Structures are given as structure tokens and as C-alpha cells.
């Protein structure tokens, strides 16, 4: 397991755009006591060696719940890393392909993870931009090698960068006021205690409802929900996570945003100790980035297109302005999800990254 985790130190040495995952998180991902998703997934970890040193890795994942939901016999590959050597990449992919066949699978797809909150999608455009806490960064030769192995595009995700306006656009101020007055919808900010309790679970049930139709999605179990809440409660800033409720307290939508942890994670070098935790704490509490990651926006299907986003933007822009935030980067969004992509149009978005799920 140590070689599987630490090989990235060789592959990305000197790369200023690479953002490491915390090594403790990688270990937890493949620990059944820490990841309840392994109850319905089979996994196999493969490591490549050349001249006595580790030069690549890949994880094979068979998500039985996802396969049943989408009626496929698919093995996923994830955590794929390799040096600039085609034979290494080919050997890794052949290993996970054979493992899939040995377990009755007839297709392979990735990069994908065990859950839908794991990083997914190989970067195919935007290599000059830094990675983030929620996405994969890889070298430009990765997609070249994948295509040479006859892997083809399944779907692409896009990420955009927008500048935070100096003033809240009148369009959103007007729309937010109209929605509040005519529908009774309003913005609520969760407390940390609410996040840890039943309210936090209700937010995850909303995500299951909103994202159920998206590529490869598998609904979260309540055990997974509790694990995610426990993991991310330390990182969460309630003021930057607006929830929209109706007059009866039903959750209609949620937006999850946070100050970027990119620079702090780079300073950790993947390690919480001895000083990694301090870099993260500073980035969360005192020395916050002027760049925000907009992790997700979810609106209940029957309320989409009814001005809920105006409530989010009206609320968040004022907070961003107070905190001196200059720009925001969206999370990966399927290129076919036109409604989600179009919500950024008033902010003159710039597409900065494209990432791809391959299949064979």
C-alpha cells in the first residue's frame, strides 16, 4: 500500500500544478472499516515496478450497486498514475482489464471511484491550471497513452472559472426578491450541529434525488452519508453553504462552496503530520484563499428553472465580496448538462478544464 500511495511523489516531482490527496484519505478509501462503499464494491490494487522502483499504479473497482442500477457488467479503473512510459501504462491497464474479465465483467470505464464523491475524469485539457481538492490532475501524456490503447470517450466534464462581480447583478437581486415574495422560498444557513444530524442527512437525500439521472451515479446509503458528513464537517463553512427551504421547511436546494484549499494541500505534501494539519487550519480559518471552489449546486427537479439559483447567487456574491474573494471555479459538470452549465452565463465564464471518462 505504501508504494501505491507514494508513487505520485516520483511522477509529479517538481510539478507546480499537481495537488496531492492526503495520504490518510487514500488509505481510508480502501479500508472497509472507514469506507462503507466497500460493502458493495470489489477492489484490486495494482502497482508497476521497473528496475526495483515503483513507476505506476491503478485500482480496479467493481461497483455492484452501480452495475445493477445501470444494467452493465463494468469494471472501473481509478487512481491511475504512471511515468512517461507507454509500456508501464499498458501493463497497468492490461492488469485491471484481466481482473475485470476474471470477475465476469465485459467493459471497463474510468477514471472513476467507489462513490460519486470520489475524483473522476482524466484531465484532457487545461494542464496549465492548478488542480484542486476535488479533481484529478494528470500529465498531458496520460490521455495520449489511453487513446493509443484504443480507449475512447464515454463522457466529458467541464470546469469553468468566473470572476466575482463587484456588485450583485440587478438581475439576481430582482429575481431573488421576486422568488422570496411570491413563493416563500428563503435561504437558510445550517449550523454545524444540524449538519451532523438529521438535517445533514436530508441534504444528502436531496442530492440523491437531484443527481440520480447523471452518468454512473449511485445513490448514497445513509451509512455513506454519515461518513461523508464526519469527514467534511471540519472543512465546512456554514456561511458558504446556503440551503433553500420552502415555507414548510422542506429542502429545495443546496449550494456547497468553500475557500480553495489548493495551496494548503500542496504545502502538506500529502501528509497531515507533522505540519500538514497546520497549513489546512490556516487556510480554513485565518489565511483564506481569495479563490473559491463551487463544489456543487443541487435543486429539486420540480423547482428547477424557477429562480432558486438566483437565491443562491444573491446570497453568495455578497459573502464573497465581504471576504475579498476574486474568482470561483466550478466543480466538474457533464458537458451534456446544458441547464447546469448555462447558469454561469451571466458571469462570462471561461472553460478552463476538460476531463474525460474513457471506456473500452
Question: Model-flagged regions — what are they?
Answer:
Residues 8-51, 56-69, 189-298:
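A conserved beta-strand-loop-helix scaffold within acyl/acetyltransferase catalytic domains
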Residues 109, 161, 243-245, 256, ...:
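Short beta-strand segments
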Residues 67-150, 268-346:
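Acyl-donor binding region in acyl/amide transferases
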Residues 136-215:
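Acyltransferase donor/substrate-recognition loop-hinge adjacent to the catalytic core
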Residues 114-116, 165-167, 193, 260-262, ...:
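Short, solvent-exposed loop/turn segments at secondary-structure junctions
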Amino acid at each position: 500500500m505504501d508504494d501505491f500511495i507514494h508513487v505520485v511523489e516520483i511522477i509529479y516531482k517538481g510539478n507546480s500544478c499537481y495537488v496531492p490527496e492526503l495520504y490518510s484519505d487514500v488509505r481510508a478509501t480502501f479500508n472497509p472499516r472507514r469506507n462503507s462503499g466497500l460493502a458493495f464494491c470489489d477492489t484490486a490494487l495494482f502497482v508497476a515496478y521497473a528496475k526495483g522502483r515503483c513507476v505506476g499504479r491503478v485500482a480496479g473497482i467493481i461497483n455492484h450497486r452501480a452495475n445493477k442500477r445501470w444494467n452493465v457488467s463494468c469494471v472501473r479503473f481509478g487512481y491511475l498514475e504512471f511515468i512517461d512510459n507507454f509500456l508501464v501504462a499498458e501493463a497497468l491497464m492490461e492488469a485491471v482489464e484481466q481482473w475485470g474479465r476474471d470477475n465476469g465483467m465485459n467493459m471497463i470505464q474510468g477514471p472513476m471511484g467507489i462513490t460519486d464523491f470520489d475524483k473522476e475524469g482524466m484531465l484532457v485539457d487545461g494542464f496549465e491550471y492548478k488542480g484542486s481538492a476535488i479533481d484529478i490532475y494528470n500529465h498531458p501524456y496520460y490521455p495520449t497513452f489511453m487513446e493509443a490503447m484504443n480507449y475512447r470517450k464515454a463522457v466529458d466534464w467541464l470546469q469553468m472559472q468566473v470572476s466575482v462581480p463587484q456588485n450583485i447583478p440587478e438581475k439576481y437581486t430582482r429575481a431573488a426578491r421576486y422568488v422570496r415574495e411570491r413563493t416563500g422560498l428563503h435561504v437558510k444557513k445550517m449550523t454545524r450541529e444540524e449538519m451532523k444530524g438529521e438535517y445533514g442527512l436530508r441534504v444528502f437525500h436531496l442530492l440523491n434525488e437531484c443527481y440520480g439521472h447523471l452518468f454512473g451515479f449511485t445513490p448514497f446509503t445513509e451509512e455513506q452519508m454519515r461518513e461523508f458528513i464526519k469527514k467534511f464537517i471540519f472543512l465546512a463553512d456554514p456561511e458558504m453553504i446556503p440551503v433553500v427551504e420552502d415555507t414548510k421547511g422542506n429542502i429545495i436546494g443546496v449550494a456547497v462552496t468553500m475557500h480553495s484549499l489548493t495551496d494548503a494541500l500542496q504545502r502538506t505534501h500529502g501528509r497531515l503530520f507533522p505540519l500538514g494539519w497546520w497549513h489546512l487550519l490556516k487556510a480554513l480559518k485565518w489565511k483564506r484563499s481569495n479563490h473559491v471552489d463551487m463544489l456543487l449546486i443541487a435543486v429539486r427537479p420540480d423547482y428547477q428553472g424557477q429562480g432558486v439559483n438566483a437565491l443562491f447567487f444573491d446570497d453568495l456574491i455578497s459573502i464573497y465580496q465581504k471576504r475579498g474573494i476574486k474568482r470561483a471555479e466550478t466543480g466538474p459538470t457533464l458537458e451534456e448538462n446544458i441547464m447546469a452549465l448555462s447558469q454561469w452565463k451571466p458571469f462570462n465564464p471561461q472553460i478552463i478544464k476538460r476531463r474525460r471518462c474513457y471506456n473500452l
